Regions:
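Metal-dependent nuclease catalytic cores that hydrolyze phosphodiester bonds in DNA/RNA
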Residues: 1-126, 256
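Hydrophobic/aromatic-lined pockets within catalytic cores
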Residues: 29, 50-57, 139-142, 170-173, ...
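Short catalytic/ligand-binding loop motif for oxyanion handling, primarily in non-cytosolic enzymes
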Residues: 33, 142-146, 185-188
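Flexible, glycine- and charge-enriched loops at secondary-structure boundaries
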Residues: 38, 154-158, 192-195, 199
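Short amphipathic alpha-helical face segments that pack within enzyme cores
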Residues: 44, 163-171
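Short glycine/proline-enriched coil/turn segments at helix->beta-strand junctions
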Residues: 101, 130-133, 171-175
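Non-catalytic protein-protein interaction segments used by genome-maintenance enzymes to assemble
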Residues: 110-164
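Metal-dependent nuclease catalytic regions and adjoining charged, substrate-binding loops involved
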Residues: 170-256
């Protein structure tokens, strides 16, 4: 059922944990939604930051690189995400410069299945790697803080982000950090003393994916194993979201 060249990934496992139905439509049925300005904002911001770091660009040229990337990726230039991406890219660059020279950017690592007792390898792509640490950049519209100024622990760090970074730390044998950044705010969070649970959760998701797809005879069998609900940000906010329309038909057809 899974393609021969299938690779696990942190994003795939997190989707499976948070919303099995969304994992099903994207990984088994190949659904791809339209460009999302908020996601493109993050892609453009980190690209601009990397260009700024690697080429020693000033703010003006970082903004230029960020805008070009945003538009090239399909972002709507008339939406607020473009301006936020430009501002975030500068804040990314300023913070990341403190870690020294970038050793690798968007490095791909593919593990052997045996490393974690799996049937399929894991594909990991890290953002900014330095000599002593790997930093994963997270662009956001705003950071939710408590009245005393600290980040709201109910929101940060996000469990899915921690699972991803604990996996990357193990695969690369190097400490990892998260850098949450909005146009007006920023916070770095390390992965020290997180324990083994986040890593165990993501490996467990990989194993569940392999088990379910091995015992099911068809994709429709997998669909019938899980109820369809839209209680996750991946499904958007409106009833006519393309992903919701696509999923409804899949579930209806599976139960005919």
């Amino acid at each position: 059922m899974l393609k021969k060249d299938f690779h696990h990934s942190a994003s795939s496992a997190n989707a499976f944990i948070d919303s099995p139905a969304y994992w099903i439509i994207t990984k088994l049925y190949g659904f791809e939604g339209p460009p999302n300005n908020r996601m493109i904002m993050g892609t453009a911001a980190e690209h601009g930051a990397y260009e700024g770091l690697s080429k020693s660009l000033d703010d003006k040229h970082i903004i230029k690189e960020t805008k070009k990337k945003y538009i090239d990726e399909g972002g709507d230039p008339d939406q607020k995400e473009l301006e936020m991406a430009e501002q975030i890219s500068i804040k990314f660059k300023e913070a990341l410069a403190e870690f020294g020279e970038v050793v690798n950017y968007q490095k791909e690592t593919i593990t052997t299945p045996e490393k974690f007792g799996l049937k399929y390898p894991i594909r990991c792509i890290t953002d900014f790697e330095f000599n002593d640490v790997i930093v994963d950049t997270k662009a956001t519209a705003y950071l939710k803080r408590l009245k005393k100024g600290t980040l709201d622990p109910n929101w940060y760090p996000k469990k899915s982000d921690v699972r991803q970074q604990m996996l990357y730390a193990r695969v690369n044998n190097k400490p990892t950090m998260l850098l949450y950044t909005s146009a007006a705010d920023q916070e770095a969070i390390d992965m020290v003393d997180r324990g083994e649970e986040p890593l165990n959760e993501i490996i467990s998701a990989f194993r569940s994916i392999e088990h379910i797809t091995s015992i099911a005879k068809t994709k429709e069998d997998v669909v019938r194993m899980f109820p369809l609900n839209f209680d996750n940000f991946r499904w958007g906010k409106t009833e006519d979201e393309p992903s919701r329309v696509f999923a409804r038909k899949i579930w209806q057809d599976a139960w005919k």
